[in-house]
Amino acid sequence: MDFVLTRLILLFLAATIIYSSEDESRLINDLFKSYNKVVRPVKAFKDKVVVTVGLQLIQLINVNEVNQIVTTNVRLKQQWEDVHLKWDPEDYGGIKKVRIPSSDIWRPDIVLYNNADGDFAIVQETKVLLDYTGKIIWLPPAIFKSYCEMIVTYFPFDLQNCSMKLGTWTYDGTLVVINPENDRPDLSNFMESGEWYMKDYRCWKHWVYYDCCPETPYLDITYHFLLQRLPLYFIVNVVIPCLLFSFLTGLVFYLPTDSGEKITLSVSVLLSLVVFLLVIVELIPSTSSAVPLIGKYMLFTMVFVIASIVITVIVINTHHRSPSTHIMPQWLKKIFIETIPRVMFFSTMKRPAQDQHKKKIFTEDIDISDISGKLGPTAVKYQSPILKNPDVKSAIEGAKYVAETMKSDQESTKASEEWKFVAMVLDHLLLAVFMIVCIIGTLAIFAGRLIELHMQG
């Protein structure tokens, strides 16, 4: 019994499907019996076809800053009424909607005007949804490659204003009128990008009058997208490493000159920076229209490192100076031995002796005026008989020579210590200066743009 009932139900469903298929087939044949897809679907020639256009943005595939091309995945929704494709559902088994190939009917030749790859038209031949009232809905998918003028001045904290200009290719405003479905594109199915944030998006309709036909308007719908770059990737992989290189450069001046590794460290930092720049150069837009912020910062870091090498050479040269080759001017002593240490609060550092008491070789009871042939400032009229002895005179002359030699060595050592002290003061001064310049330079390059973006919300 159940088997018989099942067979009856299946036969009934099969008959219904066959009957419905016959109704749909008959409907399609009747609709296209005398249909001409080249002619606009209007009753009179002066009538206009009103096309409603809506853009559904699915995905932002790629933003090519070098070639200034934005690749997007979209669905272009188009609605219009075809007066030749209407029917009464009662005559065709209650069928109210059918799906037919878009290539079999008239359709507006809407193209992307600012296309960047030459494929202006929509190439996907998808089906349209046809209502018994003649209303047609066509929602073809498309990959748009649109031209967008890239302003990379503030890269990687940049905003890009890109657009898609849509309009009919052959019909002017007296034949086909295009209206936007909404004042904004549809982003309900938009897949967020890992590099860009859709900050704002708008839609405008334009009436354009060309020189060839100043009385005939041509209509277009332009969708504008304000794209803000997400800079985290570039901050982590470019900005922070460059900042660390700058701080490492400053630490060169904290390394003692006697270690002999100051130049080695400076050159190592420079070579590391060059290798790093060669690796990340592909991440930066290669355009000559403007120097991006990150390019300025990389240039600043390079100059910073090279300047540290040059100054380090000067410091090392100062450290190894001697009185036989260089005599320290008094103004240099005044600045680097007296003034700067006191101003920079390292007066506790051991300074070279400024005033030393001269050692007296001879006592008041001894006069060597007879040796030099002149009376000394402390000479007395009485001379001991011992001084008349030639051996004593020779011993006194030897002692005088030794004293003068010791005095010369002490002055030479003192001068060398003064040069070393000046080099040490330079190191401490340059350490502070380089750290301050590193911080101020970084803020000067990036802070203004970051504050501007914060003010814009």
From Swiss-Prot:
SUPFAM superfamilies: Neurotransmitter-gated ion-channel transmembrane pore, Nicotinic receptor ligand binding domain-like
Signal peptide span: 1-20
PANTHER family: NEUROTRANSMITTER GATED ION CHANNEL
Assembly information from the UniProt record: One of the alpha chains that assemble within the acetylcholine receptor, a pentamer of two alpha chains, a beta, a delta, and a gamma or epsilon chains.
CDD domains in the cross-refs: LGIC_ECD_nAChR_A1 (cd19014), LGIC_TM_nAChR (cd19064)
InterPro entries: Neur_chan_lig-bd, Neur_chan_lig-bd_sf, Neur_channel, Neuro-gated_channel_TM_sf, Neuro_actylchol_rec, Neurotrans-gated_channel_TM, Neurotransmitter_ion_chnl_CS, Nicotinic_acetylcholine_rcpt
Catalytic reaction equation(s): K(+)(in) = K(+)(out); Na(+)(in) = Na(+)(out)
Gene3D superfamilies associated with the record: Neurotransmitter-gated ion-channel ligand-binding domain, Neurotransmitter-gated ion-channel transmembrane domain
Gene name linked to the record: chrna1-a
Sites carrying sugar chains: N161
GO MF annotation: an example: transmembrane signaling receptor activity
Protein origin, superkingdom: Eukaryota
Residues in compartment: Extracellular: 21-230
Membrane topology: Multi-pass membrane protein
Disulfide partners: C148-C162, C212-C213
Keyword terms: Cell membrane, Disulfide bond, Glycoprotein, Ion channel, Ion transport, Ligand-gated ion channel, Membrane, Postsynaptic cell membrane, Receptor, Signal, Synapse, Transmembrane, Transmembrane helix, Transport
TM region positions: 231-255, 263-281, 297-316, 429-447
Protein's recorded name: Acetylcholine receptor subunit alpha-1-A
Membership in a protein family: Belongs to the ligand-gated ion channel (TC 1.A.9) family. Acetylcholine receptor (TC 1.A.9.1) subfamily. Alpha-1/CHRNA1 sub-subfamily.
Compartments reported by the entry: Postsynaptic cell membrane; Cell membrane
